[in-house]
Each structure stands twice: as structure tokens, then as C-alpha cells.
Amino acid sequence: MTAVLLATLAALGALGVPEDHPVPAVRVVAAAPMWEPLAKQIAREAPGVVTRVAVRLDLPPPPEMLVVVTGDPPRTAAEEQRLGLDGVPPWAAGIAEASTGRIVLFAREAASYPHRDTNGLLAHEATHVLLEASVPRGARIPRWYHEGLALSVERSTSLEDALELAWSLAWSRPLPLLALEEGWPAGEVDARAAYAQALSMVAMAERHAPPGGARRLVVRLRAGDPFDRAFTIAYGLDPEILASLWYREARWRYLIRPAFWAALSFNGLLGTLALVAVLVGRERRRRRMAEWAERERLETVDYPDGPPPLSPPVNPA
């Protein structure tokens, strides 16, 4: 293992982004005239976005990238053919073609979970392109790692991710790694849970390793290692062990601990309501005693010698 680590460190110098690297050439086009203003805005910001992705991953960007801006994912085969796409899910916000360096952004979905805006979506898809362009053709990179890494580059974890994970853990077990190797859930609800799971797992792996995990992974894949071995060397955890550790931590963080505090809060609320009820009851009794005392005082004022005796009843004639 030590020899492998030394070889990895030696190979890192041949990879990465030099400080004086050229700004990547990113060409942005609109699929329809109505999207030209947005395409021009993205074109101004795209080189900086792709450069930040390259620096974050410490991987060289491709010499040229093409970004196509349109509105919605294609709904028909004719629309897919017009965009040169195939099998796009209706909830998709973007598509990356690593072999050609082409990215298609569906602008109306750019703010839908797990994304926030077009710049973040572009960073997400650019991560897919950079990662695939850096490894040998045919190298296996599981979908869960692809999506988790792309999301971690796009943004940090959020409350919405926690809610997605809590909902998923409350109603079912997380998807096994095998289910997220090549494919992705077709339904939007399951896809949202898969995105949250992938981001959380990659974030956990990055917390357990020094910076530069993606670059170390690429070096080992270039050396011919299978993904599981390359991932273990890059992050210090076998993927299956990571999944097991993540599941235990996620259940505690997003399910058990919130339920515990919710129970405490609920019991605290019940205790507060009980205390309020006791105080209200005491106040009512105090008022009744005060009213009775006031009545007795008034009777004493009206009849200093005590109340008159009752008159005998009058017998009816």
C-alpha cells in the first residue's frame, strides 16, 4: 500500500491545473431565439465557472466545450432528436456528453432540486465532463460517485438535502450502491432521494480524506486500477464500508436524533401546557375565594349584628 501511495503522489504532478492554465474555451448557443439572452449571460460567466470546477477538482478542463441552452427537457422523440438526445427523464435539468464535451441545460429546471441556478447547474454538468475526460475510455465510474461529486462541486449540503434524506430513511432503506452503479431512478421522488444520498456519501468520503480525492482517484484509474481499489486509495475507505458507515451516521443524524429532540420538545410542550393549566386553575380558585370573601364583607356591612332571623312561613289561607 505504501508503494502504491508513493506512486500516486509521484503521478499527481503530471495531472492537475497549473496556475497559469489557459481559460477554457466555452461556446454557448441557444436552441431557440427566446433563449438567446440567457445564453449570452451564461456565455459571459461560463469560462469562470468551468475554471472554478477545474481548480476544485484539480483536473485539466477539455480544450473546448459546447453548452446548449433550452427551456424544458424533451417530451417527445422528435424533440429529443432535434437536440441530439435520447432517453432524457422528464425531471432532468441538464445533460453532459463526456465524449463530445457537449452540455445541454434545461433552463426552466435549473432551480429545481437538487440544483439552484444555471451557474450551479453548469458547474454540475462540467464536473461530469472533466471527470470523464480525465480517465481512460471505458473506465468504470459509478453513477453515485459521478452525481455526488458533481453536486459537491456545485454547492454544499443544505437543509433540503437533510429533509430529503430524513423522508427517505423514514419510509424506506436507502438505495444500495449496486442500484446506483450504472442507472438512476426513473421516478422524480426516488431520483431526488438518490441525489441527496449520493451527495451525502461523497461529502462523508471527502471529510475522511485529505483534499484532492478526485485527482487521486483519477490517477489510480489511469494506472489501471478498478474503481473500488482506486476509491479506497483515494479516500481511505472501501465503497461498501463507506456505504455502511454512511447509513449508520445518516440514520442517527437525519432520523433518530431529530426524532429524539422532537420527542423532548413534545414532552416539554406537554409539561408547559400542564403548568399553564395548574396556574390557571389556581388563579380561578383565588378569584372565587376573593369573591366569597367580598360577599361576606358586604353582608357584615349591611347587617352589623348579623343577618335578621328568617320569618316563619306564611300558611296559605
Q: Where are the model-predicted features located?
A:
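C-terminal single-pass membrane-anchor helix
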Residues: 253-317
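Juxtacatalytic substrate-recognition/specificity segment
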Residues: 16-138, 142
